[in-house]
């Protein structure tokens, strides 16, 4: 998320609120919280929005154990969520052999969906934004995807909600 200084936090929350309304005002939102800038910004926006819209907000941090900083990331996320009064679960996953990036992504999405089911969450909020969308479309194009693949990610796909998708 390339932070645009012209967009203040209230405007960001308004964008997330518009997306929230567009996807039907889900009552239970589970945030995929990596601890990176994008997901932390979305966490703060959702905490602010929760005061206006009165939904249940929780978070899940998927711990792949692939980086030396993985434990510190999990501790950071837990401390931040405690400070913001957001329930958080850290889920440890095993990444199989093969394409490490693809295996990690598959393990992450399995963990997200399992946690969403366990919490009866209506949506899983992801912090994908316009830069991620461009990257996705380019990767699909390079792999020879047709028109469907070049469409990119949707704001709501199944129970995956991307409220920042239109933001640079």
Mark where each language-model region is:
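Core alpha/beta nucleotide-donor-binding catalytic domains of modification enzymes
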Residues: 3-168
